[in-house]
Regions:
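Functional cores that coordinate and move charged inorganic groups
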Residues: 1-7
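Acidic, glycine-enriched loop/beta-strand segments at the rims
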Residues: 120, 135-140, 150-185
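A short, polar/charged loop-to-alpha-helix boundary motif
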Residues: 180, 203-214
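Short aromatic-centered micro-motifs
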Residues: 188
């Protein structure tokens, strides 16, 4: 609260207290201080990333296997020493309830994946944000226009409007129906250039293959009959 009263424009990481009562929620909302809870590294309890390490299998994700060198992917996903926790020990759904209340009070919020695990971390953070009952449309707003507003970039980014930068993603499935459909990226448009979401090859306005020469380390070839 001292940050807020001193005029800080943003607060990163969750406020490690639950519940946040209406006086706190509405004060934050009316101050227009953006809160980026980074639930993936939740304060006050186990990190949300631990939950996703326990429940997801990122090693087998086709895109990660395509984009990440084998050594990098395997070292980060096959043996994770972050710890195992019973579901009821997780604190991030409680923090997510506070974020739901803040957004519904017209407050500013942002998505921050803290750089824990590239590619999937941002999706995990969105899924964690929804775990407290936030509407899927509000999660998407937090990931786009609300975050852009908090950074002062809403005149250029955050929504599809005439005059804004042509930065967007095209999905195969609707995240309004299931928030986990955020992880179905088919195309990415960056600054008016369209890229294949599975390969990062440019498909418009020119057709150009992604140069993987500096980091394309293949998975080792199996030379025995031993299965994983």
């Amino acid at each position: 609260m001292t940050n807020l009263l001193d005029g800080y424009p943003g607060h990163e990481h969750a406020i490690p207290i639950y519940p946040l009562y209406k006086d706190v929620i509405h004060t934050i909302a009316e101050s227009r201080m953006i809160v980026t809870p980074t639930l993936i590294v939740s304060y006050g309890g186990p990190f949300a990333e631990n939950y996703f390490w326990e429940t997801e299998e990122p090693y087998h994700d086709a895109k990660l296997q395509h984009f990440m060198p084998y050594e990098e992917l395997a070292s980060k996903t096959r043996r994770v020493g972050a710890g195992w926790f019973m579901k009821e020990e997780q604190v991030f759904p409680k923090h997510a309830k506070s974020m739901k209340a803040l957004v519904e009070a017209n407050g500013l919020a942002g998505i921050g994946s803290h750089g824990e695990f590239q590619g999937m971390g941002y999706h995990w953070e969105m899924w964690a944000m929804q775990s407290g009952g936030m509407k899927n449309i509000d999660v998407l707003k937090v990931a786009t226009i609300l975050g852009a507003t908090g950074l002062g970039l809403d005149k250029d980014l955050g929504s599809l409007e005439k005059g804004k930068l042509a930065d967007l993603v095209i999905l195969d499935k609707n995240p309004l129906e299931n928030i986990r459909n955020t992880n179905t990226v088919h195309f990415v448009m960056k600054n008016g250039r369209l890229y294949d979401g599975n390969t990062c090859d440019e498909v418009y306005p020119a057709k150009k293959k992604l140069d993987r020469s500096e980091w394309n380390f293949e998975k080792p070839i199996r030379t025995t009959e031993v299965n994983e």
